[in-house]
Amino acid sequence: MLDQQLLIGTVFLAGLASFLSPCIFPIIPIYFGILSKGGKKVLNTFLFILGLSLTFVSLGFSFGFLGNILFSNTTRIIAGVIVIILGIHQLGIFKIGLLERTKLVEIKTSGKSTALEAFVLGLTFSLGWTPCIGPILASVLALSGDEGSALYGASMMFVYVLGLATPFVLFSFFSDSLLKRAKGLNKHLDKFKIGGGILIIVMGILLITNNFS
């Protein structure tokens, strides 16, 4: 039970670390500028979260299903080694060029942000920034596939989305005060990135040692 609670906490922190990544956190005010149109900021934020949840939970479901077919002790160890390499990349010891790229997806919005536009913005957020948060995301997906259950994989990614989405919810309710304070965090983003790298390495070690089985 303790191991499972530790796993859930680790995955939740991984989602939070994704929010604080140097490529996402600085542009949060832009997203809230769009979501605030029409005076339905809270509703639009939840629809935005629904959009990004659809992508990530679907990924978890798929990896959990594939894990049932492909995962063995050997593949688990290989996956753990790859996750550790991704963690080292996150620390900046060396760079993997593919993971430094982002696919910027432009979305045209009307004068007022509609429910559909907020949902689509969530989908494009997921697809556009996946390369940037790739090391963390890949680590969580590896953990999702380890149990060989599609529902387990989906639930792990749901926990990841909770970690990623919680700051969005807080910003939607307290955007004015939080956005002002958030500017001061920009100078610490490199430290958050290092923390994310350490978290990734820990997940890789846990995969190799199979501590969550």
From Swiss-Prot:
The organism of origin for this protein: Haemophilus influenzae (strain ATCC 51907 / DSM 11121 / KW20 / Rd)
Name recorded for this polypeptide: Putative cytochrome c-type biogenesis protein HI_1454
Keywords, sorted A to Z: Cell membrane, Cytochrome c-type biogenesis, Membrane, Transmembrane, Transmembrane helix
Family under the similarity heading: Belongs to the DsbD family.
Bilayer topology term: Multi-pass membrane protein
Domain of life per record: Bacteria
Places the protein is found: Cell membrane
InterPro entries (UniProt xref): Cyt_c_assmbl_TM_dom, Cytochrome_c-biogenesis_DsbD
